[in-house]
Amino acid sequence: MSSDIGDVIHKTNSMEIADNYPKTCQEFLNIRDEMFELFLRKQADYGPTNVGMGSEVVDTDDKVKRSLIGLSVRMNDKVQRLLNLTLNNKVPNNESLEDTFIDIANYAVMALIVQRKQWGK
């Protein structure tokens, strides 16, 4: 099967999903936009060296490793908070569960950017 046919099949399946679940797909796009807005606000506060562990540009294997460790710790903090709140039926005192989910998603995207050595560029 050529890649052109594969692309057509993929686009057809994607369109069927979007057509069958329009509210779900629209909400996904809305959340993506919220994630990006939060990312921009936090980057304005923290700057790129926060993720780069002191380096503005993450472009070496060593910098990638250090940055991924830092991001993993931050993600784990959020996951542990989420587990504590949900397993113990607690109401959050500070940030909402929704904020926690968005933070985890943003950390995951940031980790991908770091992994691809595009952070700070």
Give short role names for the model-derived ranges:
Residues 1-121:
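Intrinsically disordered, low-complexity regulatory regions
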